A protein has these predicted regions:
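A structural "domain/chain start" motif
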Residues: 24-94, 204-209
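C-terminal motif of bacterial Sec signal peptides marking the signal peptidase cleavage site
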Residues: 19-22
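Bacterial N-terminal signal peptides that target proteins for export
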Residues: 2-12
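Sec-exported extracytoplasmic/periplasmic mature domains
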Residues: 101-109, 135, 199-206
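Short secondary-structure boundary motifs at beta->alpha junctions and helix caps
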Residues: 79-87, 159-200
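Surface-exposed short loop/turn segments
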Residues: 24-43, 107-159
Length: 209
């Protein structure tokens, strides 16, 4: 028996609708990811550069490999994991670089940080290797963690590359609770504490040439 073109079109449309409906229901459902940042807890940036500025070039540095991306690293009983459904708004290494610049710009001391491609007389070269940037659950997975930021700083002469000084800086800031909303502020405080000490040390070590 011959079927009319209208009936055939209706049958095809119905079949297509069923197929599309099935495709929609098969798509995985993903939970929204919360985005956070750190490094904005510093003082306001100074409006003018201090007199007698010492030019310090910020050299390329290392960052803890597993923590350099946009995921938050946790350590529990020696096991490395990432906080679920939580991300930095940008890779941690990018936020760290911005925080370093902000810390030096906000300080009224003699040091002026010079970034790659920026003009200026280089008196010293500063290297900051971030060895640890993580939340440690030392008291168990259900307890509030401690955020650890550990940085190795080295300062060398801009003229002959001789080592002027080096030091390890570390901050351990306990979160007030085992919640992301309390862990993020601990990161902010740890970063601010370490950078404050680094700026003070750099100002004291990088004497005018």
């Amino acid at each position: 028996m011959m079927r009319s073109p209208a009936l055939l079109r209706l049958a095809l449309a119905t079949t297509s609708a069923i197929i599309l409906s099935g495709c929609v229901t098969l798509l995985p459902k993903t939970k929204p990811v919360d985005l956070y940042r750190f490094g904005e807890a510093g003082a306001a940036v100074s409006a003018s550069a201090p007199t007698g500025t010492v030019g310090v070039f910020r050299a390329s540095s290392l960052f803890q490999r597993e923590a350099g991306g946009d995921q938050l690293v946790t350590i529990t009983a020696g096991k490395v994991a990432y906080l679920a459904e939580t991300r930095w708004v940008a890779p941690a290494v990018v936020l760290w670089d911005a925080a370093v610049l902000t810390a030096f710009d906000a300080d009224p001391g003699p040091t002026r940080l010079i970034s790659r491609g920026e003009a200026g007389k280089v008196d010293y070269v500063l290297r900051l290797d971030v060895r640890n940037f993580e939340a440690r659950f030392d008291k168990g997975p259900k307890a509030a963690p401690t955020v650890v930021v550990r940085v190795r700083a080295s300062l060398t002469s801009g003229s002959n590359r001789s080592l002027t000084g080096e030091r390890i800086f570390e901050a351990q800031v306990p979160a007030t609770d085992n919640r992301v909303s309390e862990i993020i502020p601990a990161y902010d405080r740890a970063v601010a504490e370490v950078l404050k000490d680094i700026v003070v040390w750099t100002n004291a070590t990088a004497v005018p040439c």
